[in-house]
């Protein structure tokens, strides 16, 4: 996994940073996959989504499909990897700020 991580998960980050991230990953708690969900928030609340245009972990077309289905405000960041929050922090922050500003209106 550590050899694939920089290429697949963090392709638009500097190699040393991607390697550090590969070494510092922790396992996800299994209960996140089995916890019951009674209501999907996107059915009653506005949502925002970022399509990472060069994501190799989640296909960008699938990301776009999910966001369209949820009627999300969609931002596409061409060339961004799955680590978009680190490689494009200003653009991600702008989406978060837009959501914070408009979510309650």
Where are the regions a protein language model picked out?
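Helix-rich cap/lid subdomain of alpha/beta-hydrolase
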Residues: 1-39
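Alpha-helical elements of Rossmann-like donor-binding domains used by nucleotide-donor carbohydrate transfer enzymes
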Residues: 4, 20, 62-65, 91, ...
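Short glycine/proline-enriched coil/turn segments at helix->beta-strand junctions
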Residues: 26, 44-45, 70-73
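Short secondary-structure boundary/capping segments
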Residues: 38-41, 64-66
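Short beta-strand/loop motif that positions the catalytic acidic residue
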Residues: 43, 48-51
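Conserved loop-alpha-helix segment in the C-terminal half of the alpha/beta-hydrolase fold
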Residues: 53-80, 86, 98
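Post-His helix in hydrolase/transferase enzymes
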Residues: 86-102
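Alpha/beta-hydrolase-fold serine-hydrolase catalytic core, especially in secreted/extracellular enzymes
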Residues: 105
């Amino acid at each position: 996994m550590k050899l694939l991580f920089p290429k697949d998960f963090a392709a638009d980050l500097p190699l040393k940073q991607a390697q550090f991230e590969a070494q510092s990953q922790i396992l996800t708690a299994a209960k996140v996959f089995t916890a019951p969900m009674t209501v999907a928030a996107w059915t009653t609340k506005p949502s925002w989504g970022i399509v990472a245009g060069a994501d190799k972990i989640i296909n960008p077309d699938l990301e776009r499909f999910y966001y369209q289905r949820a009627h999300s405000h969609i931002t596409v960041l061409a060339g961004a990897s799955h680590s978009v929050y680190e490689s494009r922090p200003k653009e991600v922050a702008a989406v978060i700020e837009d959501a914070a500003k408009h979510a309650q209106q």
